[in-house]
């Protein structure tokens, strides 16, 4: 076995020749001599055969990493206006590694390339797109994507086009849907937000995916905002929109009736009926808590269609979500509600919030007046003494 293939300390032309020799030694169809057309032609030919590294069993991932690192160091030295095809070709090659250990090396190489490109370079988008693809392959998506705000910040200096962001959001949703449904749901909502009134009708498939992802996510309970998204509005009158409306504002019996009439549709969307029931019970509890400061266990049994021995475990599960603040009285077989998140937040809720804030303001004004009165009395008493 040869020693580590390190090229970074050499001049660019020398690096290119050593890379040619190394790749030819692995069986690549490339000459050992430098191109007479210059470094860009050298790099074009080197990138064209660099995936031969992924078929070689005589070099460690660390050695392959050194080779790819050398290629990256040459790429970033090429002027941006002449490097686009080279970067796109290199990114494509990095998706070819089959073995997990080598795919991780490719991920590192793409990250180096992404990090070393100017933040104003439009090519960073293309590198990042391939970065996500490879991250999915090695189950390391969380290393390159932590949230929509972080993503926007990365491209703040050179925002991708609307179409590019839609393509990226679709990829991220596909990557996240099985491992992080909550984040996948947020990505899909962001995707739908990129559509305008003019093109919302073309977002049918994205809108349906967004709804299904949100319904399937066990941690997404505030579904009302989806109804205001333009692409979702275009689905009004269709079964998927009707199902969303049930989850937004109806109770468990409405869902059970919908499932009874449209069982095949629900199953065809990949939704789990038992998980849907579990979610609808929690949403129904939230709705009951909005108008009831206390509820008996028997009331919960009837409303949520659960057995007597299931009531206490259910309440505990509700409290774990922190959507409802409550106290369970096992002796009296009641639950006392302190507060709950509203399933919908429309004009009545805004009015309620306004009234509450005005009440606080009035109380604080009264407290301040009382303090001023006491303070004035103390000052007057002190002056008399």
From Swiss-Prot:
Residues of the PCI domain: 180-342
Keywords assigned: Cytoplasm, Initiation factor, Protein biosynthesis
Regions annotated as coiled coil: none
Protein task: Component of the eukaryotic translation initiation factor 3 (eIF-3) complex, which is involved in protein synthesis of a specialized repertoire of mRNAs and, together with other initiation factors, stimulates binding of mRNA and methionyl-tRNAi to the 40S ribosome. The eIF-3 complex specifically targets and initiates translation of a subset of mRNAs involved in cell proliferation.
Similarity remark: Belongs to the eIF-3 subunit M family.
Entry annotated with the keyword Metal-binding: no
Protein name in UniProt: Eukaryotic translation initiation factor 3 subunit M
Binding partners and assembly: Component of the eukaryotic translation initiation factor 3 (eIF-3) complex.
Gene Ontology cellular component annotations, sorted alphabetically: eukaryotic 43S preinitiation complex; eukaryotic 48S preinitiation complex; eukaryotic translation initiation factor 3 complex; eukaryotic translation initiation factor 3 complex, eIF3m
Molecular function in Gene Ontology: translation initiation factor activity
Stored SMART domains: PINT
Annotated GO biological process: cytoplasmic translational initiation; formation of cytoplasmic translation initiation complex
Any Pfam family: PCI
Record keyword Amino-acid biosynthesis present: no
Organism: Anopheles gambiae
Cell compartment(s), UniProt: Cytoplasm
HAMAP family: eIF3m
């Amino acid at each position: 076995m040869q020693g580590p293939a390190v090229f970074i300390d050499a001049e660019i032309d020398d690096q290119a020749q050593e890379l040619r020799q190394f790749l030819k030694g692995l069986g690549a169809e490339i000459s050992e001599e430098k191109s007479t057309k210059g470094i860009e032609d050298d790099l074009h030919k080197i990138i064209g055969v660099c995936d031969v590294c992924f078929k070689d069993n005589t070099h460690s991932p660390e050695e392959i990493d050194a080779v790819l690192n050398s290629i990256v160091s040459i790429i970033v030295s090429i002027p941006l206006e002449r490097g686009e095809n080279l970067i796109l070709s290199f990114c494509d090659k990095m998706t070819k590694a089959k073995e997990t250990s080598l795919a991780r090396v490719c991920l590192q190489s793409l990250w180096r390339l992404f990090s070393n490109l100017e933040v104003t370079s439009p090519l960073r988008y293309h590198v990042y797109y391939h970065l996500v693809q490879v991250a999915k392959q090695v189950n390391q998506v969380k290393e390159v994507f932590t949230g929509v705000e972080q993503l926007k910040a990365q491209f703040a200096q050179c925002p991708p086009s609307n179409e590019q962001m839609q393509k990226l959001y679709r990829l991220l949703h596909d990557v996240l849907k099985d491992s992080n449904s909550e984040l996948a749901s947020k990505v899909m909502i962001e995707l739908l937000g990129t559509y305008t009134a003019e093109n919302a009708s073309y977002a049918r498939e994205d809108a349906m995916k967004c709804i299904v992802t949100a319904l399937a996510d066990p941690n997404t309970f505030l579904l009302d905002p989806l109804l205001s998204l333009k692409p979702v509005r275009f689905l009004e009158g269709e079964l998927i929109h009707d199902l969303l409306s049930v989850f937004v504002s109806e109770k468990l019996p409405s869902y059970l009736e919908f499932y009874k009439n449209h069982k095949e549709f629900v199953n065809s969307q990949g939704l789990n009926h038992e998980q849907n029931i579990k979610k609808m019970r929690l949403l129904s509890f939230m709705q009951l808590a909005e108008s009831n400061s206390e509820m008996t266990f028997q009331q919960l049994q009837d409303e949520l269609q659960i057995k007597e021995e299931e009531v206490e475990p259910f309440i505990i599960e509700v409290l774990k979500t922190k959507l409802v603040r409550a106290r369970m009285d096992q002796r009296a077989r009641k639950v006392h509600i302190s507060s709950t998140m509203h399933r919908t937040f429309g004009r009545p809720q805004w009015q309620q919030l306004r009234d509450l804030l005005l009440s606080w303001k009035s109380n604080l004004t009264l407290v301040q007046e009382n303090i001023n009165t006491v303070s004035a009395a103390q000052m007057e008493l002190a002056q008399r003494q």
